[in-house]
Curated annotation (Swiss-Prot):
Disulfide bonds join C43-C54, C71-C169, C144-C161. GO terms for biological process: myelination; suckling behavior. Expressed only in regenerating islets and normal exocrine pancreas, but not in normal pancreatic islets. Expressed strongly in pancreas, weakly in liver, but not at all in gall bladder. Its main location: secreted. It comes from the Eukaryota. The gene is Reg2. Coiled coil: none annotated. This is Lithostathine-2.
């Protein structure tokens, strides 16, 4: 058994050496990375792709709970979870480019037990934070989170969950 492993290692070393010296052509490796088909993300009309998800801005104004339920009924999604600065920039751009006049747009971030422990409605881990100055508020506590137009939709503010805002749904492509 050990002898077979030695032969395998020797073979792999020789192949690597030959390849690195240009003696083995790329055509000898039919499944080279450049030949693999790229994954095309198909989102429904009106939705935009980012990563492996589709994002859909809904301009109708609903409460946070109604908005999340709407997203769940739409392709088994949730209100948008924003997990990185890059995703935050994408969502902000999506909202701005829509031409919406909404001053606030719901995200999926909420505090379901009103104890200042924030959770994404999708179940994603809450690691990335982008709170607006003074948020979350200690004086005017809200338990649902929106993006605000006065921060170009890049910063978060805690709001009353019964307020009615436009929202962004996020679902797997």
């Amino acid at each position: 058994m050990a002898q077979n492993n030695v032969y395998l290692i020797l073979f792999l070393c020789l192949m690597f050496l030959s390849y690195s010296q240009g003696q083995v052509a790329e055509e000898d490796f039919p499944l080279a990375e450049k030949d693999l088909p790229s994954a095309k993300i198909n989102c429904p009309e009106g939705a935009n792709a980012y990563g492996s998800y589709c994002y859909y801005l809904i301009e109708d104004r609903l409460t946070w709970g109604e908005a999340d339920l709407f997203c769940q009924n739409m392709n088994a999604g949730h209100l948008v979870s924003i997990l990185s600065q890059a995703e935050s920039n994408f969502v902000a751009s999506l909202v701005k480019e829509s031409g919406t006049t909404a001053s606030n747009v719901w995200t999926g971030l909420h505090d379901p037990k009103s104890n200042r422990r924030w959770h994404w409605s999708s179940g994603s881990l809450f690691l990335f934070k982008s709170w607006a100055t003074g948020a979350p508020s200690t004086a005017n506590r809200g338990y649902c989170v929106s993006l605000t137009s006065n921060t170009a939709y890049k910063k978060w503010k805690d709001e009353n969950c019964e307020a009615q805002y436009s929202f962004v749904c996020k679902f797997r492509a």
